[in-house]
């Protein structure tokens, strides 16, 4: 009877700990969202008000600049909402993965067509090995992983810097590396970059776009695929985010 009671107490303590962690996560999320969303929303509202009030007096170049700013802020907000929904659904077990064999090089190319216009300020290249890069995945979610990794590289590197996406086979996995030649990540921050809400100190990054959900989401999505996400240095400077997915056992000819 004592052993049963001890197990009951231990289970209650564990449940209380999980509940406290969930409440802390919810509090962090609400606090961070309410703080960090204010700037882009204020920017959208201010720019839209300017257009409504001064449309007839603004020259074409100024109107285009204002519309571009509104578009960029709106796109960032859309991406944020998609990340939040994906994290919530996966961690609640409500995300039904639509797994099928996909060619990784085709997924990468499709992803690049969805990358925001900011990618035009960087040099993005791709490298694929000669073998068939077939992996089992939910292509929509893996595209979201690649978008987040590339957006992260864009955010933390100078305009005009290089970002390379390479895909290749390694043993029983398909590997994708997203590398940049930026300043890299300090050693003391490497263990934290995958934590939700963590944002590194970087003068290049846009300070109001710093929820720190992207890498946490990437790792969550890849864990649901039985895959991994790692970080290493890109010599002489920069970093490489690398993820692996199991190879598909389906033949490309089937």
Where in this protein do the model-derived segments appear?
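Short alpha-helical segment of the dimerization/phosphotransfer core of two-component systems
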Residues: 72-77
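Short conserved segment of the HATPase_c
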Residues: 185-199
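Short beta-strand/loop element within the Bergerat-fold HATPase_c
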Residues: 160-172
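Short alpha-helical Gxxx[C/S/T] motif in the catalytic ATP-binding
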Residues: 214, 218
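Short helix-loop "hinge" at the ATP-lid/N-box region of the Bergerat-fold HATPase_c
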Residues: 153-154
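Conserved catalytic submotifs in the C-terminal HATPase_c
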Residues: 98-103, 125-133
């Amino acid at each position: 009877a004592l052993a049963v009671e001890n197990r009951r107490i231990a289970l209650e303590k564990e449940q209380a700990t999980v509940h406290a962690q969930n409440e802390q996560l919810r509090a962090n999320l609400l606090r961070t969202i309410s703080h960090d969303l204010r700037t882009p929303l204020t920017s959208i509202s201010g720019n839209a008000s300017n257009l409504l009030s001064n449309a007839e007096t603004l020259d074409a170049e100024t109107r285009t600049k204002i519309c571009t700013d509104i578009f960029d802020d709106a796109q960032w907000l859309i991406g944020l909402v998609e990340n939040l929904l994906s994290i919530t659904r996966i961690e609640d077990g409500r995300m039904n993965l639509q797994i099928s064999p996909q060619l990784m090089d085709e997924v990468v190319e499709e992803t690049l067509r969805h990358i925001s216009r900011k990618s035009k300020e960087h040099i993005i290249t791709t490298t694929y090995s000669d073998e068939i890069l077939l992996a089992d995945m939910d292509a929509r979610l893996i595209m979201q992983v690649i978008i987040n990794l590339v957006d992260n590289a864009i955010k933390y590197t100078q305009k005009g810097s290089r970002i390379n996406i390479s895909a290749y086979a390694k043993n029983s996995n398909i590997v994708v590396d997203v590398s940049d030649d930026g300043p890299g990540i300090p050693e003391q921050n490497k263990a934290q970059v995958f934590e939700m809400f963590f944002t590194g100190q970087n003068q290049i990054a846009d300070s109001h776009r710093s929820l720190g959900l992207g890498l946490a989401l990437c790792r969550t999505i890849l864990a649901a695929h039985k895959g991994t996400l790692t970080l290493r240095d890109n010599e002489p400077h920069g970093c490489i985010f690398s993820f692996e997915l199991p190879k598909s056992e389906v033949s490309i000819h089937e």
